[in-house]
Swiss-Prot record:
InterPro entries: Cyt_P450, Cyt_P450_CS, Cyt_P450_E_grp-I, Cyt_P450_sf, Cytochrome_P450_78A
Annotated Pfam families: p450
Domain of life: Eukaryota
Protein name: Cytochrome P450 78A3
PANTHER family: CYTOCHROME P450 78A3, CYTOCHROME P450 78A7-RELATED
Gene Ontology MF term list: heme binding; iron ion binding; monooxygenase activity; oxidoreductase activity, acting on paired donors, with incorporation or reduction of molecular oxygen
Requisite cofactors: heme
Length: 523
């Protein structure tokens, strides 16, 4: 690899020789050189960040990709529906398998192909996360999602798999999920035959479920004085901050300005989170029990080598609340939208429910385990409307590596456009059609796993950085959807049809909240 002198040394040497008379000429020459280098870097495939790397480390082969603009590269790809824009750019560059682009000074690769996705997601080289200012400001660098690859992160993963999301803990929380489902049914029953927006009910249910699992605190969905409104605001603020594309993450000269007000908003949110979660930890420590009722109890009972500091516990527990709340609500809203839009599919799910459960009692989680068409519907909605179309949080290479035959240097951000993979006609037959039958027909994908083993549909990620709560999330979504479809028929509102327009925040959600009517089915 060719070595090069620090870019700043020649500037210092040149300016030291300046006099007042020739300073203007020196500045003009320096500006011209800077512009020349800027445009030279930009002229390379992939844009300025890749051009800077290629200048000093000429590769054997260059990854295709758009140049974007000088200095900022392809920052425009990350505006609005980034997964759409990136897929279109990959098609234009004929680089669906692997495309390079620049976000300011950040080198990025992205794939829209399942084979290359598997190569990236299962590679130990891409076990780290890229730096994100909002994640660090919100303490998530000490939680499972954003913690740097190393001993601490491996310890968190072990705690999550052995204690927090183990089958025993998931089974122990079955009753609370059933009680929350019953509360949702009660609220919707009181609004039957009237147009209603279901999003707030789903968000409250998801938040209540996570609060009970994580902190052992139970909330009544219909109680306006339960404190859930204030807690929901904290979660929404964190969700919005992490979902914002922060230009300062990719343009170092903006780091001191906080032009998007992200650092200021994080600094206001963190003390409130610390007080809220810290108080709960203190209460649990003061009244410690023999049984581990919730995640706080589990963390407090860990043996000495695995014990976490209070600040680390706050980060881990807050991330659990944050990650487990909106994703479940967003996905169920998409499922109910599809049920209202496709009544024949809804009827088939309800026929299966009636055959397995009957109408004399409510659905139990054990009932869902023997169903085939309902899980197929959930998989098909995940295929068409993946909550994390770019798998939400990107990967970072910790060493030089080779992906799809191309050299990828250490420090490169990698993305997987799962939205593009899920709509690729070379991967799926009639990819734009809503057909749950593709997962249940003979010779189809009845046993198709969405938990990470098949890159064609891996909404929870795959490999070392897969979502640790995927089994709990899958169980919750299937059970609640079964309960809601068993109790009600879902039809579009008279005022509005079903609008499938999406908006990309941290997750891809419905741009316009679903407005429907519900009709009781069980008397």
């Amino acid at each position: 690899m060719t070595s090069h002198i620090d870019d700043n040394l020649w500037i210092i040497a040149l300016t030291s020789k300046c006099t007042q008379e020739n300073l203007a000429w020196v500045l003009l020459i320096m500006g011209s050189l800077w512009l020349t280098m800027t445009f030279y870097y930009w002229s390379h495939p992939g844009g300025p960040a890749w051009g800077k790397y290629y200048t000093y480390s000429p590769p054997l082969s260059i990854i295709p990709g758009p140049k974007g603009f000088p200095l900022i590269g392809s920052m425009g790809l990350m505006t609005s529906l980034a997964h759409h824009r990136i897929a279109a750019a990959a098609a234009t560059c004929r680089a669906k398998r692997l495309m390079a682009f620049s976000l300011g000074d950040t080198r990025v690769i992205v794939t829209c192909h399942p084979d290359v996705a598997k190569e990236i997601l299962n590679s130990s080289v891409f076990a780290d996360r890229p730096v994100k200012e909002s994640a660090y400001s919100l303490m998530f660098n000490r939680a499972i999602g954003f913690a740097s690859y190393g001993v601490y992160w491996r310890s968190l993963r072990r705690i999550a798999s052995n204690h927090l999301f183990c089958p025993r803990q998931i089974k122990a929380s079955e009753l609370q999920r059933s009680q929350i489902a019953a509360q949702m049914v009660h609220i919707l029953n009181n609004k039957r035959h009237r147009s209603l927006r279901v999003r707030q009910v789903l968000k409250k249910a998801s938040l209540s479920n996570m609060m009970c699992s994580v902190f052992g605190q139970e909330y009544k969905l219909h109680d306006p004085n339960s404190g859930m409104e204030d807690l929901g605001i904290l979660v929404d603020q964190g969700y919005d901050l992490l979902g914002l594309f922060n230009w300062a993450d990719h343009l170092p000269f903006l780091a001191h300005f906080d032009a998007q007000n992200i650092r200021f908003r994080c600094s206001n949110l963190v003390p409130m989170v610390n007080r809220f979660v810290g108080t709960i930890i203190a209460e649990h420590r003061a009244s410690k029990t023999e049984t581990n009722r919730d995640f706080v109890d589990v963390l407090l009972s860990l043996p000495e080598p695995d014990q976490l500091s209070d600040s680390d516990m706050i980060a881990v527990l807050w991330e659990m609340i944050f990650r487990g709340t909106d994703t479940v609500a967003v996905l169920i809203e998409w499922i109910l939208a599809r049920m209202a839009l496709h009544p024949h599919v809804q009827s088939k799910v309800q026929e299966e429910l009636d055959a397995v459960v009957g109408k004399a009692r409510a659905v139990a989680e054990d009932d869902v385990a023997v169903m085939t068409y309902l899980p197929a519907v959930v998989k098909e909605v995940l295929r068409l409307h993946p909550p994390g179309p770019l798998l939400s949080w990107a990967r970072l290479s910790i060493n030089d590596t080779t992906i799809d035959g191309y050299h990828v240097p250490a420090g490169t951000t990698a993305m997987v456009n799962t939205w593009a993979i899920c709509r690729d006609p070379h991967v799926w037959k009639d990819p734009l059609e809503f057909m749950p039958e593709r997962f249940v027909t003979a010779g189809g994908d009845a046993e198709f796993s969405i938990l990470g083993s098949d890159p064609r549909l891996a909404p929870f990620g795959s490999g070392r950085r897969a979502c640790p709560g995927k089994t709990l999330g899958w169980a919750t979504v299937n059970f609640w959807v079964a309960s809601l479809l068993h109790e009600f028929e879902w039809v579009p509102s008279d005022e509005k049809g079903v609008d499938l327009t999406e908006v990309l925040k941290l997750s891809s959600e419905m741009a316009n909240p679903l407005t429907v009517k519900v009709r009781p089915r069980r008397g």
